[in-house]
Amino acid sequence: MTALTASVLPQHRVTSSTSALPQGSVRYRLADAVDVIAGEEGGGMLFSARPLMALRLNASGVGLLSGLSASEGRTLAEVAACVPELSPLAAAGFLEELERRRLLVRQPAVPVAWPPVSIIVAAHGRPAATRACVQSLLSLDYPSERIEIMVVDDASDPPLAAALVGLPVRLLRLERNIGQSAARNLAAAEAGGELLAFTDNDCMAAAGWLRDLVPYLGDPDIAIVGGRVIGPSATGAVAGFEAVRSPLDMGFVGGPVGPREAVAYLPSCNLIVRRDVFLACRGFAADMRLGEDVDLAWRVLRSGARVHYAAAGTITHDHRARLGALLRRRADYGSSEADLQDRHPGNGRIMHLPCAGLLMLAALAAFPLAWPAAAAMIALAAGMAAIEGIKKRRRLRRIGLAVPATRLAASIIREHGASLYHLGHDVTRYYGLPVAAVSVLWPPLLPVAAVIMLVPPVCDHRRLKASLSLAAFIGLYWLEMAAYQLGVWRGCLARRCYRPLLPLIRWRS
């Protein structure tokens, strides 16, 4: 949850990533629940209702945004024309800054000519699924003469050639299994497309997959774009859980990708990358069987290019519907963290510790033992929240915005609730098993452990609108987290790298 802030966005600000003006007729619109409020003397503010946020704007900023709404976008040229004295490059930098803050939504331009795309499917076994995958690719709503479909048969037994008879694909057969990463790299080296699109043979592409995602690469700064990965219609508790909790689905909101962003990586089953960038970065790390997609995105980011997630361009993945398979895969994913931290030591995990929330949890543990001390902790936490509210209200009044006290209080409560949610998620994912064990040995800690480990699944069950019961969802959530945690420990021990368990601590007042 973003804290309430007030700041000045100067008219001359140009972001360092803006190397060229956006191409074509890319459009910008206000994000949902965001409004431009004009003030006196030409200035004003950009106001977000949820999360509660206010950004002060000068006259140029108000002029640029005055014609935008949440329902209709405008091109950069149309926006820049509102303030003729401002250069289009400066206007582009200003809009990009707001997009990064998720206050604006960028709608990519449709290319004048669709670029050639090589679609690469690295396959091992699953002949029927491989044929179905290729058939979905042949049904894409994209100029057929601009598509090359390449299937790398990574030493399948029996070979996949028989399953692909009659389909116009380029089949590369390997007699020795080299793994998905190396197989993809092999195909990329021989591909003829300007763009490389990756998916897996247990996936089905939506008809608009390429048309939805390729336009984002009209921005010369974006090197990789990826879309949503969803599951088929769910039947059963495990399938219903995986449908809303799959680590391949990056959610409903698009935006920049990076280790410090809301979306940290893009899965390789729905990934489009510029071929020249892919080859310059030497492709996927061939020695990685897991986490290779995270590693690729982070290396591309390190080169100075951008990676973007679009909540469109969907791929349907055949999710695991059996509990054992789901837990094994989560453990495998967890085991890749140590390898990734070894390769990217600067991308360590950050753990935010909310001071007021920790005081409330400490009071919960102390109450049976020393209730006066617990009451004092509760009073201190409440006082901290009250002071926070007073400061924010004063800050809002200074920029001319009157927010009702009830609305401000609700915003602060949501913010602290979100902090507790993220704390609970981190603790459950990385330390849940020892916390549970210590709680059994020292019962006063049980209520604290219960709150920490119940808040995230209860919130997710409601937020994600899971089809299974709350009790089943909580149980599967805990099992999933325990499996991932064991995988993290396994990877740490194997690589003798313990950074995944030692996050950077950031305190929140």
What are the residue ranges of the model-derived segments?
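Acidic, low-complexity/disordered tracts enriched in E/D and polar residues
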Residues: M1-G67
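Short aromatic/hydrophobic "clamp" motif used to bind/position activated sugar donors
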Residues: L196
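Active-site-adjacent helix/loop segment of glycosyltransferases
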Residues: A310-A374, I390-L468, A472-E480, L486-R490, ...
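Conserved donor NDP-sugar-binding/catalytic core segment of glycosyltransferases
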Residues: G208-G240, D318
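Glycine-rich, basic loop-to-helix element that forms the pyrophosphate-binding segment
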Residues: L174-A191, N201, D212, F252-A264, ...
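Short, acidic, metal-binding catalytic loop of nucleotide-sugar glycosyltransferases
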Residues: Q135-R146
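A conserved acidic beta->alpha catalytic loop
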Residues: D153-A161, R176, C203
